[in-house]
Amino acid sequence: MIMKELEKNYNPSAIEEKLYQKWMDNKYFHADAERGKREGKKPFTIVMPPPNITGQLHMGHALDNTMQDILTRYKRMQGYEALWQPGTDHAAIATEVKVIDKLRKEGVDKHDLGRDKFLEACWDWKKEYGTRIIKQLHKLGSSADWDRERFTMDKGCSDAVLEVFVKLYEKGYIYKGSRIINWCPVCQTSISDAEVEHEEQDGFFWHINYPIVGEDGRFVEIATTRPETLLGDTAVAVNPEDERYKDIIGKMLKLPLTDREIPVIADEYVDKEFGTGCVKITPAHDPNDFEVGRRHNLPEICIMHDDATIDCKGSKYDGMDRYEARKAMVEDLKKQGLLVKVVPHSHNVGTHDRCKTTVEPMVKQQWFVRMEEMAKPAIAALKNGDLKFVPESFGKTYLHWLEGIRDWCISRQLWWGHRIPAYYCQECGEITVAKSMPEKCPKCGCTHLKQDEDTLDTWFSSALWPFSTLGWPEKTKELEYFYPTDVLVTGYDIIFFWVIRMVFSGYEQTGKCPFNTVLIHGLVRDSQGRKMSKSLGNGIDPLEVIDKYGADALRMTLITGNAPGNDMRFYWERVEASRNFANKVWNASRFIMMNMEKAPVHEVSLDDLTMADKWILSKVNTLAKDVTENLDKFELGIGLQKVYDFIWEEFCDWYIEMVKPRLWNDEDSTKAAALWTLKTVLINSLKLLHPYMPFITEEIFCNLQDEEASIMVSAWPEYKAEWNFEQEEYAVETIKEAVRAIRNVRTSMNVAPSKKAKVYVVSENQKLLQIFEHSKVFFATLGYASEVFLQSDKQGIADDAVSVVIPEASIYIPFAELVDIAKEIERLQKEEERLTKELARVTGMLSNEKFVSKAPEAKINEEKAKLEKYTQMMEQVKARLAQLK
C-alpha cells in the first residue's frame, strides 16, 4: 500500500467539501430496511427535528444536529442500520409572513392576489429558499439520509395529515367550538403558545370602583392592568373563604361605563392576598377568566374586532384602537369618580414572536383537539418506562404539561399550510369532514359545498413526523423496520409544543411510543450568558465559524463540556482550542505516517511489545470501553473529553515522545513493534474521535489506509481482554509520575532543558527500583537526566540536592553545578517584591466598594482572576526561596 503524505498544515476548507461529496457519492448515509433485515442488523433511527424552510443555520441548529450526527455515526460504526431521517417544516406563519413581505415590496397585496396565486408564490419561495438550511447542514457534516428528505407538505405527509384529521373527527376528538385562543391582531390569525414571547413590561394597576346595586355609596374595588377589557366583564369574583366579601356574594354590581349589571361570584381561583381580593372576570379576553366563566356559566362577550379595535355597538369607544380606548375609558372613569388610584406595576405581556404585536386572548370559533383521553397513554408511557428523558428531571416538565393539558386549538387563519378538510353545505350548513371534497351533502343532497378557509397549526403535521416520514399510513417496509425510532434530540423549550404531541399522536395512530428516549439539550448563549438574539446583536453565525476554523472545531466546541439539558456559553477561545486540538491530531498523524513510509508496518506478536507499547495499547483499550459507555448513556461531552485527554496527553505528549529514540534507531529490535503500536493506536483513536470530528478523522484514515476506505463505515473499536496490561500500566504511570516530578523541579529552579542533571532515586521498594532500571532511557529523554542512580538510601547524595517525593520513593537532583544559587535567590526576591505590589493593588481594588458597585462585571471578574493567579505565583516563589535557602 502506498500512503499519501499529509499536507504540512491542516486546512479544513481544502478537504471538507471534497470529503462530504465522497460520502454522498458512495451513499454512506443511506439506510436500507431490506439490507438491514437481510444482513440481520439492528435498526437505529433518529428523526431530525425539521428546521423551518424560512430558517438559516444558527447555533441551536448546529448543536442539535451535531448531537444527532454523533449518535448516528457511532451506531453506524457499531454495525447498526442507522437511519437519520431528515426533512423540513413548512412553517406556516413564518413562511406566509416572508412571502407577504416579498409581495409587498413588489407592490402586490395578498388578498388582491387571491388564495391560489398566493399559494403558488409560497411554493416558488420554498423552491428558492427552502433548501438553504439543508445545504448549511451539509457544511456541518450531517450524515442524514438525504435521499429520504421529507417536507411537512409533501404528498406523503399531507396524506397522513388528512388521515389523522378524519380519524380524530370521527372519534369525536376533533371538534369545532368557541374557546379562548391567542390572537394576533396584525397577522389576524390564532397562534400557538410557542409563538408567544413573554416579556416583563412596566405598566399599571388601575383600581376601579364597581358600585353595588341598591346600596348607595358602597362599592367593590378591583385592580386591573387592562381597563379596556372592562366592557367585556360578566362578573366579579371573590374567594369564598374571604371574610371581607362573604356578605356581597350573589349581589349585583353596576358595570362602569355601561348600562349592564354583573354578579359577584365565589371562586377559589381568587387569591385573597393579592390586590384587593376582588377580580374582574372577562371570560372572552383572559384564559383564567375563561375557565372561571365556564365553571359559572357566564356569558362570553368579545369586545374586540380581529384588528383589536373595540367592538361595542352604540358605545363611544366602538371602533377605537384598544390602547386609545384604554386612555379614553380611564379618563371617563376619573370624571365619574370611579377611578380610585393608579399604581405602577411590572407584569408579563405576551407578544407575537413574528411581528412583535401584543397578543390578544380572545374567545373564537376554532377547531380543537380534545386532549383529556389522548393524554392518558402519553402520561402512562413515562410512568411505566416506555419513554425516558435525559436528563431525567425533564420528565417532570413533560408530566406537568400533560396533567394540566387543555384542548389544543389547531386552526389558523392562514393560507399556507394544510387546509382543514371540513366542507360546509351552502344549503343546510351541515359540516362534512372528509379526505376530499364530497360530491354532495350527506344530509340534504346539495352539491354546493365549500371548504373551510382555515389551515392547521404547523405542529399538527410535525406531531406525525416520526411515522409519516416512514410512509404511514401505508404499511411500508421502512415503517415496519425503523419504527418506533430510538432517540429524539431536541431543546427543552419545545417539550410541550412538539415532544408531547408526537407521543400522544404516536400512541393514537400506531399504538406505540414514537421513540424510547428524549435527549434534551439547552440553549447556546453568548460568553456573558445572554440568549443570542438579533436585538442584542450577539448572534454568532455557525457558518462564519466553519469558514474560519472548520466544521470539526465548531462541533468539538459545542460538545466539549456540554451536559444534557444545560445551557452552554459560546467562547471564541474554545473554538481556537478545538482548532489547536485538530492541529495536534494532524501533526501527530503526519509524524507517524512519515515514519511508516521509511519502514513498512508488519503485524507483530503482543509478546514483542515493550512495556510502553503495552501501556498505550491498554490505555486505548480502556478508552474504547469508556467512550462506548459514555455514548450509550448519552454523555457525549464526557466521551469527547476522554478522547481529547488520551490523544493529547497519553498518546502525543507521552507515548510518541517515549518511542522517538526507537524510531530513529534502525538497529533497534523493537522498532517494528513501535511502528505497529503507533499505527494501531492511531487508527483506534481516530475511530473513537470520528463521530465528533468526522472530517479530519476521515482524511487521515483514508491516507493511512487507502484512498477508497472510509472511517465512517469501519468497525467501532471494541474492548479486547488480551489488550489489558495492568502491570505495564502501573509501571508506566509510576515512571510518568517520576518524570513529571523531575520536570516540575527543574521548571521551579529555572533550569533549561538543555542542561542535563544527575538524578538519584531512593526507595526501599525493590520492585519500583526494578521498574526504573528498565526505564532509564525515559529519564534521559523525558526528564533531561545525564545519569540515573537507583539506590535504597541517601548515600553519596549531596546535602544541597533538591528533593521531591513521589509514592514510595524520593528523587534528588543536585543543581549546584547548573544553577547560580545566589543569582536565583536574587531573581526570586525581585519577583516576590513585584507580586507583593500587584497583590496590594488588586486587593485594594476589590475591597473598594465604589469600584465593585460601578465597574462592569467582566472587569471585576478579570481582577478576581488576577488575584487568584498572583496568589498562586506568590506561593510558588516562596516555596522556591525556601528550597534554595
Which residue stretches match the model-derived regions?
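Short acidic-hydrophobic surface loop/beta-edge motif
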Residues: 206-213, 251-256, 350-354, 423, ...
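N-terminal, positively charged nucleic-acid-binding surface of large information/translation enzymes
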Residues: 2-241, 265, 282-295, 299-314, ...
